Each structure stands twice: as structure tokens, then as C-alpha cells.
Amino acid sequence: GGMPEAVECYAKNRHFSEVRTIQNEILNAYVLDFAKHAPHQDIPKLMQVWDSIPAQLARENRKFQFAALKSTARARDYENAILWLENAGLILRCFLITKPGQPLTAYADRSSFKVYALDIGLLGAMARISPEILVHGHVLFQEFKGAFIENYVAQTLVGITGGGLHYWKNEAATAEIDFL
């Protein structure tokens, strides 16, 4: 991940457990910031969205599923929470493109999107993946590894381009391009 304090800690000590402690402190600070800065009525929904990120990414179809938050959840009920997290820079949204044309934003389906964590290291902490598993691999990590790498690419692209993530899939959902 790109969190300066965590990177500095690893560069000095080379102890993943200390880095994970810092990452968990950062995550806890974000949750406290929800209570300080977010509209009071949105805080429970912010927490639901925030806590769901690893599970949303773990699924084969990584499109954000509101029903994964709550069986009766609807997009309009969670839009403010998602916008708040996005505007705070805590999540990255990647919108489905209905056809690959320019400009991409003209063909974006704003109701169909994927959500990524702002930082790959923090995603590992959110998912409670042992740093040793990340470094050395493990058979249990194979399935989530694709989502983890996809999040890394999203984070890197936003760092290079400043934002505007988009993906494409055909109508039959037999082909997909993760990033355009």
C-alpha cells in the first residue's frame, strides 16, 4: 500500500506485523472520521458499505451488489453513503461502459459499478489477510488474489490518471475488460 507511515515502518523495520498495526490504526481513524464528518443519518450505511468492500471484491461478479449489504437494500438508500466515501477518497468507483467509445463518461452506466479500496495495504488489513500470506502465498488466498490484484491496478491507474475508472462487459457477460 501507499500509506506513508506504513511504508516508512516497513522500510525501517521489515516487520509486517508492525505495518499491519499501523494499517489497522489508519482504518480505525477512518471509522472515527465517519462519526466526526459524515451526516449522522448516513453513518450506519457508510459502515455497511465500508465493511462490505472485501466481500464485494471476493465475488466472481465484482459489480457492487446492494443486496449484499442488506436483503432489502436499494441503490437510492445507499447512494449518499457511497458518494461520501468516494468524495472522502476512501473508495474508488469503476463504472460500467455500455459501449467502448469516446468520451468514456458519455457511455458510463452510473447505476452499475465496482468499488475498490483506496489502498491495497488497507484492503489486506480490512480483509484480515495475514501479511505473510500476501508475501509468500497460500492456497486459501488463490481466489481472492485476483480481486486483490484488480484493486492494485485500480489504485495505480487512479494515481497515474487522477481518476475516472471504467470497465466494459458484453451483454451476455461472457467477456469483460476490467479497465478501459
Each PLM stretch: what is its role?
Residues 5-180:
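Accessory nucleic acid-recognition modules appended to NTPase machines
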Residues 1-3:
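Amphipathic alpha-helical segments of the small helical/lid subdomains adjacent to P-loop NTPase cores
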